[in-house]
């Protein structure tokens, strides 16, 4: 909404899945659409929400080369960078090379990690002086970029040693939740697929096969879940026409209860 409210049009470059079901960037599509629509402002998501990809250095380098060739300023949403699973590693987009450092506005926050979205504690990292001046000028007019005293102290606490301990323990909990959910989907939910996320606490399940076999709509599946207390989100908001977005940031006992209800009442 912020983009549209600013009078801009959104052009999407959809991710694609390879033969192993891993979500990938479509660099050719990205380059084509940037040229076709004369785009010079790109919003990039790393780690990706909702598919959970943690982009590796080669992938990030290829993406930044496309943006460099087309003279694009990049806003890199790295709000999920604390929630990294297994042995994956988040690589800040600005660390790829000097050009990436110059043309990128990186956005961070502790809201996802510590559940502090209501405190308005997000911040940006900008190295280019011209871009920095432009952002400062716009934010000073709206005051939207201003933090309050409480959010400042929350940020300090989050980035303390105690905060790091919390983050590490949180990732362990989420990893166990993901293990359970993926195993449950693969073994007990016929017609539902999901690629294991590498980061975030979101699942992006694909119900295409189930919808075709059951002759149901995604809306009907979503409603049947809500009717039995399963809170989930329509994946069409994320260009997944047969997908549902599920939040796994909760105790494992609740994850088990939710998936048991899916099998008993929804995917039947």
Language model region names:
Residues 1-268:
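PLP-dependent class I/II
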């Amino acid at each position: 909404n912020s983009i549209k409210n600013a009078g801009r049009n959104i052009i999407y470059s959809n991710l694609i899945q390879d033969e192993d079901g891993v979500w990938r960037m479509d660099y050719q599509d990205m380059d084509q659409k940037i040229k076709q629509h004369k785009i010079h402002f790109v919003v990039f998501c790393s780690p990706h929400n909702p598919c959970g990809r943690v982009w590796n250095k080669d992938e990030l380098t290829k993406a930044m080369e496309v943006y460099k060739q087309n003279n694009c300023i990049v806003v890199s949403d790295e709000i999920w960078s604390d929630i990294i699973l297994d042995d994956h590693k988040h690589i800040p987009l600005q660390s790829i090379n000097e050009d990436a450092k110059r043309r990128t506005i990186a956005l961070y926050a502790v809201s996802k990690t510590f559940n502090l979205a209501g405190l308005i504690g997000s911040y940006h990292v900008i190295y280019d002086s011209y871009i920095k001046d432009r952002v400062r000028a716009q934010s000073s007019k709206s005051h939207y970029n201003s933090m309050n005293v409480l959010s400042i102290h929350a940020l300090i606490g989050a980035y303390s040693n105690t905060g790091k301990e919390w983050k590490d323990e949180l990732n362990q909990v989420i990893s166990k939740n993901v293990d359970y959910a993926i195993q449950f989907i693969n073994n007990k939910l016929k017609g539902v697929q999901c690629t294991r996320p590498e980061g975030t606490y979101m699942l992006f399940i694909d119900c295409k096969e189930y919808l075709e076999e059951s002759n149901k709509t995604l809306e009907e599946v979503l409603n049947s879940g809500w009717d039995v207390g399963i809170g989930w989100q329509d994946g069409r908001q994320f260009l997944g026409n047969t997908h549902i977005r599920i939040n796994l940031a909760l105790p494992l006992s609740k994850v088990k209860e939710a998936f048991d209800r899916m099998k008993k009442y929804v995917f039947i």
